[in-house]
Amino acid sequence: MGKKGKVGKSRRDKFYHLAKETGYRSRSAFKLIQLNRRFQFLQKARALLDLCAAPGGWLQVAAKFMPVSSLIVGVDLVPIKPLPNVVTLQEDITTERCRQALRKELKTWKVDVVLNDGAPNVGASWVHDAYSQAHLTLMALRLACDFLARGGSFITKVFRSRDYQPLLWIFQQLFRRVQATKPQASRHESAEIFVVCQGFLAPDKVDSKFFDPKFAFKEVEVQAKTVTELVTKKKPKAEGYAEGDLTLYHRTSVTDFLRAANPVDFLSKASEIMVDDEELAQHPATTEDIRVCCQDIRVLGRKELRSLLNWRTKLRRYVAKKLKEQAKALDISLSSGEEDEGNEEDSTAGTTEQPSKEEEEEEQLNQTLAEMKAQEVAELKRKKKKLLREQRKQRERVELKMDLPGVSIADEGETGMFSLRTIRGQQLLEEVTQGDMSAADTFLSDLPRDDIYVSDVEDDGDDTSLDSDLDPEELAGVRGHQGLRDQKRVRLTEVQDDKEEEEEEENPLLVPLEEKAVLQEEQANLWFSKGSFAGIEDDADEALEISQAQLLFESQRKGRQQQLPQTLPSCLKTEIMSPLYQDEAPKGTEASSGTEAATGLKGEEKDGISDSDSSSSSEEEESWEPVRGKKRSRGPKSDDDGFEIVPIEDPAKHRILDPEGLALGAVIASSKKAKRDLIDNSFNRYTFNEDEGELPEWFVQEEKQHRIRQLPIGKKEMEHYRKRWREINARPIKKVAEAKARKKRRMLKRLEQTRKKAEAVVNTVDISEREKVAQLRSLYKKAGLGKEKRHVTYVVAKKGVGRKVRRPAGVRGHFKVVDSRMKKDQRAQQRKEQKKKHKRK
């Protein structure tokens, strides 16, 4: 015999438990919550009537979502436990007594919402139960029509049966919007659905037959349609082909394609385009691909059709241009023919045409005069508007006491001969101070010219003569040095241009009150005095680190500068590079060697660029330094002169060895025989030549665990190196140690400042002891010194002790009692959380 399942417990779903947790009296409360979330009918309601309200879950939801001063009435056959701000009645909604009781409670009020979640006692047969529920819904609708206000809502539960459609038709006659829905809280196996009726029409008179079950649920005989009625008598007209179109293949000409108003529609109907015009066929746009596409348009894709449209556009432009040229030629020929005919005409015809020409000239002259008058009037209006606008501005300035009455706006501009505002740069200032030198220029132009200016073109000619005198190798060397020299000149000219631009931006007539370096330092101090840099400013160690980093960077850069000349051959230093270094050195000093010349150039560049903006100097350093670094870091390179520059080899990077590697290294370093034996033993039966990735990972891991040869290392040595490795791992990294030291230093500094403030508070005489304690507590709290974590002592409880545990002997402060059960519960909770995470993934 089969075992019957527990029906009651299986129906306890998540909404059942949610109702228990939130305090609702039934799980059906969530149905109303979901309906209200979708249709929003409770927030605006001021009065509500709940029919079949027991046990009161829907009343609880209504009291929660409706305004506080709302009127809520609940009716049911069974008594309902009292709820705050809710009136409950124990009546039968199908009787007249219930209607009288509701009128007594509501008085003259009309409700905005009527709810009905009622259902009869079920269990006899499904047909009887469905009819009883439909009858109960009809009675609820009758009450709703009596007490519902215009535009109100009626929400009811209905069973899906054959009486559902008649009910829906009655709802549609009385309400503006009727929607049937099934909320998520309603069980899937349940036959209930909820009908939301909104916008009550409130008719003056409702036919009583609507609420009569015999009439409302009366079966209507539907006449069956015969076969002749189902078959359509007239055959519909076939669509898809044009009338009179007997063929599906349409051949058109290219001229029709060019004249088509809608080319896309033309291509959809055409099958082939014939290029019948010889001139269009010879056009450059008519390629072989276009000819192939024109042969069968129905098989073309989007790309080919777009190419045909572009081809049509080009041809239309060509044809339009050709027609314009023909029209111009025709006009010229016609004008020449008319002149000939005019010469051959009689004098009488000329006399008849003269009056007409004179009339045209007179009319044209009058039109020109009218246009000139209109332009003059417009110009006068424009000047008048401008004058009025200036007067209005002047009047406003006088009213605001910005100007004197006798001063006009026209006097504001500097129209004098000596205007200081026009001087915007150093060059203009020099021109003003020098005066007019045009006379001197004319005097110098009259003098005979002894000096000869050699242009760049003549220099190029000298270069060509030099090329003929030198060997190819010497010529290559000279050209290389010349290129380097030109690069240096370009950089120096760029720096000078930047200087000139800065001088032009600054007004030379304005004398700065402070020097530029002092002004830049004050601007930097003003920037770093903001609140966001307060913590950085207080930390002395941060400034120390920055200064140390700058010193280290300078020393490394000087070292690189000193290493570069050492790597060059001696002949490269003395013979070839000495002219270059002499060019780079300052004019007032002479370089004794190539290295001194290079350092001299560096110093000159630094001094020259220090006055310029910091960003430009940093960009120059960044653009020069990496070039030198790249030349050193890469392999040996041969310069244009044929000399090989030997790079400085960086030391090899050390590998980080594990304890096993350290022990093997000690064995290898101890004796050559042990090293040789170790190498020989590395070729054994456990050694294979598989590539990485050929074997599965689980197989490789298993081989490493079970098929490995023991190394000739003792346990003591391995333990020694493991201990040493653990000590190394226990040390904090440099950054962590520095951060901890900085944190400790900040805390000590903060503690010292707080101690000084506390001494000042203690020495104050004007305040009481209680105020002193409060101020000291606030000082230590702001300093972050009173935020010590409370120490918790864990006490393991024994079995049979019970819930109340006394403080054990020797335990001070806060303590917590734990047991093995709590540990197991925590582990179970962690396992559940892990399972939930895996399910979400």
From Swiss-Prot:
PANTHER family: PRE-RRNA 2'-O-RIBOSE RNA METHYLTRANSFERASE FTSJ3, RIBOSOMAL RNA METHYLTRANSFERASE. It catalyses: a ribonucleotide in rRNA + S-adenosyl-L-methionine = a 2'-O-methylribonucleotide in rRNA + S-adenosyl-L-homocysteine + H(+). Keywords: Citrullination, Coiled coil, Isopeptide bond, Methyltransferase, Nucleus, Phosphoprotein, Ribosome biogenesis, rRNA processing, S-adenosyl-L-methionine, Transferase, Ubl conjugation. InterPro entries: RNA_methyltr_RlmE, RNA_MeTrfase_FtsJ_dom, rRNA-MeTfrase_E, rRNA_MeTfrase_SPB1-like_C, rRNA_MeTfrase_Spb1_DUF3381, SAM-dependent_MTases_sf, SPB1-like. It comes from Pongo abelii. Belongs to the class I-like SAM-binding methyltransferase superfamily. RNA methyltransferase RlmE family. SPB1 subfamily. This is pre-rRNA 2'-O-ribose RNA methyltransferase FTSJ3. There is a cross-link at K357, K573, K637, K653, K672, K704 (Glycyl lysine isopeptide (Lys-Gly) (interchain with G-Cter in SUMO2)). RNA 2'-O-methyltransferase involved in the processing of the 34S pre-rRNA to 18S rRNA and in 40S ribosomal subunit formation. Interacts with NIP7. The keyword Secreted does not apply. It is found in: Nucleus, Nucleolus. Residues 816-832 have a biased composition (Basic and acidic residues). Residues 332-366, 454-482, 579-654, 805-841 are annotated as: Disordered. GO terms for cellular component: chromosome; nucleolus; nucleoplasm; preribosome, large subunit precursor; preribosome, small subunit precursor. GO terms for biological process: maturation of 5.8S rRNA from tricistronic rRNA transcript (SSU-rRNA, 5.8S rRNA, LSU-rRNA); maturation of LSU-rRNA from tricistronic rRNA transcript (SSU-rRNA, 5.8S rRNA, LSU-rRNA); RNA methylation. Pfam families: DUF3381, FtsJ, Spb1_C. The keyword Cell membrane does not apply. Signal peptide: none annotated. It is an enzyme of class 2 (transferase). Citrullinated by PADI4. Residues 337-347, 456-474 have a biased composition (Acidic residues). The modification Phosphothreonine is found at T567. S-adenosyl-L-methionine binds at G56, W58, D76, D92, D117. Its EC number is 2.1.1.-. Residues 356-404, 733-771 form a coiled coil. Gene3D superfamilies: Vaccinia Virus protein VP39.
